[in-house]
């Protein structure tokens, strides 16, 4: 009887795990990143077109306020947390501020456990080189001293100008 009870519990646990995180079980790192990117972009698109309207303080820095439709993303973590809840990993919305891209909505954590808002996209990294050309970057990146498998895609306004960056990533094993 004990053996069958154990097997039932194991089966229930396995079924629950598969239902809650199928992408992480069956997909590899590249597929995970691509699926997460599609999710963050589709969630943003349901809010509306990306625009920059006004400025706002993010972690003490005054930066442009990026919106999807009427929803301001600066200091708003709903979208990135929903993505993390659904597919794991990390997600960020960056806004272009001068020559930098600043994290305004993120679930990437600093060493002290706080959200890494106000930090910038590595100015010497491969991702920013691609984004500066209006291109996407998929590959490894160092994020706040830790290796991640990542995806970065430009956020464009209605005129096609790059106004920000979508980011998703998974800590490299």
Language-model segments: which ranges?
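Conserved beta-strands of PAS-like sensory domains
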Residues: 67-71, 147-173
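Short N-terminal helix-loop-first-beta-strand/juxtamembrane motif that initiates sensory/input modules
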Residues: 35-53, 80-101, 138-140
């Amino acid at each position: 009887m004990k053996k069958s009870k154990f097997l039932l519990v194991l089966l229930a646990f396995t079924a629950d795990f598969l239902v809650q995180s199928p992408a992480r079980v069956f997909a590899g790192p590249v597929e995970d990143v691509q699926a997460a990117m599609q999710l963050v972009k589709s969630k943003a698109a349901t809010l509306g077109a990306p625009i920059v309207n006004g400025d706002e303080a993010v972690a003490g820095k005054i930066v442009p306020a990026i919106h999807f439709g009427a929803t301001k993303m600066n200091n708003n973590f709903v979208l990135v947390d929903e993505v993390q809840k659904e597919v794991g990993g990390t997600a960020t919305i960056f806004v272009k501020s001068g020559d930098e891209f600043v994290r305004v909505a993120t679930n990437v954590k600093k060493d002290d456990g706080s959200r890494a808002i106000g930090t910038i996209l590595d100015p010497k990294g491969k991702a920013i080189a691609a984004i500066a050309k209006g291109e996407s970057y998929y590959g490894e990146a160092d994020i706040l001293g830790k290796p991640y498998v990542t995806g970065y895609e430009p956020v464009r306004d209605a005129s096609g100008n790059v106004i920000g960056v979508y980011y998703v990533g998974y800590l490299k094993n």
